[in-house]
């Protein structure tokens, strides 16, 4: 009987070890998990690291929140969704398979991927943090405005920085062209105190009402907000432009933004616009757009 009791104890220890390891990982912020529903119909996927936390909506692969040391890095309006499928400001959104407007419908701006539900393809954790890959698959003829077979993968990795990778693969039998971009809404204390680096030849202040595309000058660029002592350092690869949007007081009412919201963020993100020549992919070819962000003082 005594050997049986020892075996039972060994089995209990084996069950306790994984649970203990899971608790350690959770306490260190090394695990990712799915959480409750959003205000829409999307499921939220959460990434955690020692320094921060990210929440991603599976609808549109949109980052709803990025917190570093307890502070929100992205601005999100009180009403996160625009009606009728229109573009919704806030967080970090994707523009695919076109950047800008195509057609006259409200839902035509920045492509249809932002309204699609992505599939959770994989999730990984490490001592440095965690990452998740979300996928969207299109069959030939599925979308009238983009009737090609393609797959889109979004990989988000959170360590001491946040990296977003957008990978487009031509899975069909004919070539196609597309454009894309990341649209972040960086929270600021005052848009009047923001300086941008690496966008033009020299540093410059954000201008009230600015909505402009600047040719890519290199991988690195930054946004410094003197009003809250924060600097966002970023790099981008696979883009032709950097898009700067500082609506300030010029556009007080814009889709899901309330009065005053336009003065609380700056948009600064990489894009590959059709105006500079869309990305052309032959069958089997892929293209990646990588956007890496780090928060400092």
At which residue positions do the language-model features occur?
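Intrinsically disordered, low-complexity Pro/Gly/Ser/Thr-rich segments with frequent PxxP/GP/PP motifs
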Residues: 276-288
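Bacterial N-terminal signal peptides
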Residues: 20-29
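Extended, loop-rich substrate-binding clefts of extracytoplasmic carbohydrate-active enzymes
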Residues: 37, 107-159
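Active-site/ligand-binding surface loops and adjacent short beta/alpha elements
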Residues: 173-247
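Beta-strand-rich N-terminal accessory domains
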Residues: 33-91, 219-240, 248, 285-297
